[in-house]
UniProtKB/Swiss-Prot annotation:
Protein name per UniProt: Glutamate dehydrogenase
Keywords: NAD, Oxidoreductase
Keyword NAD: yes
GO molecular function: glutamate dehydrogenase (NAD+) activity; glutamate dehydrogenase (NADP+) activity
Active-site residues, Swiss-Prot/TrEMBL: 102
Organism the protein comes from: Zea mays
UniProt record similarity statement: Belongs to the Glu/Leu/Phe/Val dehydrogenases family.
């Protein structure tokens, strides 16, 4: 089941639990706007290359639409649509005043030079600048993009609309980015994991963790969990996987990964097959890479007691059912990885106010938002006798539905 089908299925289950009117349900599912643009740029060798860019603006009942822009060769309309919809529910679960959006360009960023990436970003911004804005749609980094990408978007957008630092988040700090934003998603994963474990009388210290993915989210989650006393025993990335039952030295692994462009060859553990990582013996499994990695083919072999979805849609619905029967608790993506968009909100607020927060305030506010969101999800679980995923979806969908009705937008 692809990401769009799975997300729509979860939404429909939540709508049924909430008893939503069929017309309202239909209107909440249909995106506000779908944008598809051609982006043609001159390559460094003088040839022309064309790429297709997408932006799906799903819902704005609760505020400006919010979501990342990813550069990846497999970007397609269905994936962008699904991720935009997920952002709508995620911002509602976090209770920040945003709707959902997502964008992307079908390209392989590793095959493009820095100057080519800049030209591509600026052309894409030229095509969508009148459809995004501080109070309309606020992009952010995602897979294949970073703070530099946001700086280019800000600069290009400002040529048309005047200097507008709040038009994107995840910017460099020197251009109005927030302190703590780089680590925000990984730190949110830590806070969400702490909240879940505390419900069962446990803490981070002494728990065994396995993390799939060592990009921004996975590496920060690993560092922060290790600092909190957790034992990270196995990690993978696109280059390979490494395991040490006594716990990996995360600081050394970060250094090795930076110097060697991946964790392959790390001497502080034994190399293992990346495919076996998800089924390693552990207490907490954190998928922090691509979607759909936990499926009906490997769900029965998963030994973790808890799964924290740091990636978007890492667990297929079929696997969800299998794991539920096994008693595995899954903290869903729309709660577990909401730290990034929450601190993006803090950045947006700082830009609008023209007042910068210190990092301690950012992190303290993030802990408050994540912990409160977890408590709200648990309350929905009790009210509707459902699991954490449906608790999160019913919470998010209910908040968006109420805003839609209050604004008189229901069909």
């Amino acid at each position: 089941m692809n990401a769009l089908a799975a997300t729509s299925r979860n939404f429909k289950q939540a709508a049924k639990l909430l008893g939503l009117d069929s017309k309202l349900e239909k209107s909440l599912l249909i995106p506000f706007r779908e944008i598809k643009v051609e982006c043609t740029i001159p390559k460094d060798d003088g040839t022309l290359a064309s790429y297709v860019g997408f932006r799906v603006q799903h819902d704005n009942a609760r505020g400006p639409m919010k979501g990342g822009i990813r550069y990846h060769h497999e970007v397609d309309p269905d994936e962008v649509n699904a991720l935009a919809q997920l952002m709508t529910w995620k911002t509602a679960v976090a209770n920040i005043p945003y709707g959902g959006a997502k964008g992307g360009i079908g390209c392989s960023p590793g095959d493009l030079s820095i100057s080519e990436l800049e030209r591509l970003t600026r052309v894409f911004t030229q095509k969508i600048h009148d459809l995004i804005g501080i109070h309309t749609d606020v992009p952010a980094p995602d897979m294949g993009t970073n703070s530099q990408t946001m700086a280019w978007i800000l600069d290009e957008y400002s040529k048309f609309h005047g200097y507008s630092p709040a038009v994107v988040t995840g910017k460099p700090v020197d251009l109005g980015g927030s302190l703590g934003r780089d680590a925000a998603t990984g730190r949110g994963v830590l806070f969400a994991t702490e909240a879940l474990l505390a419900e069962h009388g446990k803490g981070i210290a002494g728990q065994r963790f396995v993390i799939q993915g060592f990009g921004n989210v996975g590496s920060w989650a690993a560092q922060l969990i290790s600092e909190a006393g957790g034992k990270v025993i196995a990690i993978s990335d696109v280059t390979g996987a490494v395991k040490n039952v006594d716990g990996l030295d995360i600081a050394q692994l970060v250094k090795h990964s930076a110097e060697n462009k991946g964790i392959k060859g790390f001497k502080g553990g034994d190399a293992i097959a990346p495919d076996s990582l998800l089924t390693e013996e552990c207490d907490v499994l954190i998928p922090a890479a691509l979607g759909g990695v936990i499926n009906k083919d490997n769900a029965n072999d998963i030994k973790a007691k808890y799964i924290i979805e740091a990636a978007n849609h890492p667990t297929d619905p079929e696997a969800d059912e299998i794991l539920s029967k096994k008693g595995v608790l899954i903290l869903p993506d729309i709660l577990a990885n909401s730290g990034g968009v929450t601190v993006s909100y803090f950045e947006w607020v700082q830009n609008i106010q023209g007042f910068m927060w210190d990092e301690e305030k950012v992190n303290a506010e993030l802990r408050t938002y994540i912990t409160r969101a977890f408590g709200n999800v648990k309350q929905m679980c009790r009210s509707h006798s459902c699991d954490l995923r449906m608790g999160a979806f019913t919470l998010g969908v209910n908040r968006v539905a109420r805003a839609t009705v209050l604004r008189g937008w229901e069909a």
